[in-house]
Amino acid sequence: MEKIRTRYAPSPTGYLHVGGARTAIFNFLLAKHFNGEFIIRIEDTDTERNVEGGIESQLENLRWLGIIPDESIYNPGNYGPYIQSQKLATYKKLAYELVGKGLAYRCFCTKEKLEHERQLALEHHQTPKYLGTCRNLHSKHIQTNLDNQVPFTIRLKINQDAEFAWNDQVRGKITIPGNSLTDIVLLKANGIATYNFAVVIDDHDMEITDVLRGAEHISNTAYQLAINQALGYQRIPRFGHLSVIVDKSGKKLSKRDTKTIQFIEQFKQEGYLPEAVVNFLALLGWNSDFNREFFTINQLIESFTVNRVVGAPAFFDIKKLQWINAHYIKELSDNAYFNFIDNYLTIDFDYLKNKRKEVSLLFKNQLAFGIEINQLIKETFAPKLGVQHLSVKHRELFKELQSALQQLSEQLQALPDWTKDNVKSTLTQIGEQFNLKGKKLFMPLRLIFTNKEHGPDLAGIMVLHGKTQVLALLQEFIHATNLF
């Protein structure tokens, strides 16, 4: 059986987007499911769009997700180089070989001429397409241009009568007629290979067997099949084109939408766990055989098959990601949780500063993402407390509670140790003694200590407030009988 080799081939043009991350995850899972190899190749031939630090950012964010390549620029194998800018001579040599065989040709058309033709096509409501001006130039004309050092690109001669078809692993049979394609540029005027030309050569040289990528590459696949054919390559990867990721309005997720966090770096900064992000992204366009939502990376590897990948649009639901992340946060041990959350914790209440771990643990079961803890702390400990700050509706809850509050105050005063267990036990005793079940006791107490109806563990809140403040607040409510 052939060894499965997949690849993720980002361009260093910025941060790792969820679309690229999902592509990397799917290719990683496919390779590992079959005990194959996953390669990361850097496609940096579009020099105008490359940004400084782009390569490091892409690879670091993939490492954070746990998507570790078997081969890359940092751990090369036998199929390098793993960055296209180090392979320019190979692309150039092969492009000129195609010219020599009559399968490609030099195009001397200027940018201005090509832009004029493009605008004319658009004005006539036609798809812009190269008109083939230089396709059949006489050899003397070509030589004259070369002697005069006229800049040129190299274009592939597309067979307009051919059909380019493949059995897409996600979408089934796809056929694109040759007459819908243009004579694609293989080599730019600066001698640098274009994306479509370089990717075909790299996939061949690296023995890539399977390529899963975004739906926007469907049209590129037809060109790549034509290039494979021209180069005489017999081994062509199996292609699969993934679903489009859409926002809540059904539109394709746009990197320009700054209101939606959609870059892996942002998830790190907001306090999402890498396991949760991988779990969430794996479910964008893939359905498991199991009726479940939570998968470890090893469970994903075991379960992932291409026949469960769907082509229908995948909804990017940030609420679902938060729900998944909350699950993973709850699963952490207390020590692991504190080590995680301490990176996001900014406590500015003096009486809480020496209780970072206790405060953090109080909100463990409420958190959707790390940075949210500061808002939860603020909502719980910052509200103005006391009878005068209660709404009229809430004051109604305290009718006939004075005796219970007085007894609670006395029992709390008598506690030898101010611990959560002791406070919780006292609350239970008061509830039983006065037949105050559930909300009849706990909601009024929450209002006393947080001015909120809901929140984290009540005993934990009381312990963090401290015995003195708890007793003082209870006495204020006990003596405010005229307000209830």
UniProtKB/Swiss-Prot annotation:
Entry keyword annotation includes Oxidoreductase: no
GO cellular component, one term: cytosol
CDD domains to which the protein is assigned, alphabetical: GluRS_core
Assembly information from the UniProt record: Monomer.
Keywords: Aminoacyl-tRNA synthetase, ATP-binding, Cytoplasm, Ligase, Nucleotide-binding, Protein biosynthesis
Functional description taken from the UniProt entry: Catalyzes the attachment of glutamate to tRNA(Glu) in a two-step reaction: glutamate is first activated by ATP to form Glu-AMP and then transferred to the acceptor end of tRNA(Glu).
InterPro entries: aa-tRNA-synth_I_cd-bd, aa-tRNA-synth_I_codon-bd_sub2, aa-tRNA-synth_I_CS, aa_tRNA-synth_I_cd-bd_sf, Glu-tRNA-ligase_bac/mito, Glu/Gln-tRNA-synth, Glu/Gln-tRNA-synth_Ib_cat-dom, GluQ/Sye
Cell compartments where the protein resides: Cytoplasm
GO biological process, one term: glutamyl-tRNA aminoacylation
Reaction catalysed by this enzyme: tRNA(Glu) + L-glutamate + ATP = L-glutamyl-tRNA(Glu) + AMP + diphosphate
Record-listed ATP binding positions: K255
'HIGH' region, short sequence motif: residues: 10-20
Organism whose genome encodes this protein: Mycoplasma pneumoniae (strain ATCC 29342 / M129 / Subtype 1) (Mycoplasmoides pneumoniae)
Gene name of this polypeptide: gltX
Pfam family, one: Anticodon_2
GO molecular function ontology, one term from the record: tRNA binding
Entry similarity comment: Belongs to the class-I aminoacyl-tRNA synthetase family. Glutamate--tRNA ligase type 1 subfamily.
Motif annotated as 'KMSKS' region, chain positions: 252-256
EC number(s) on file: 6.1.1.17
Official protein name in the record: Glutamate--tRNA ligase
Source lineage: Bacteria, Bacillati, Mycoplasmatota, Mycoplasmoidales, Mycoplasmoidaceae
Group of enzyme by EC: ligase
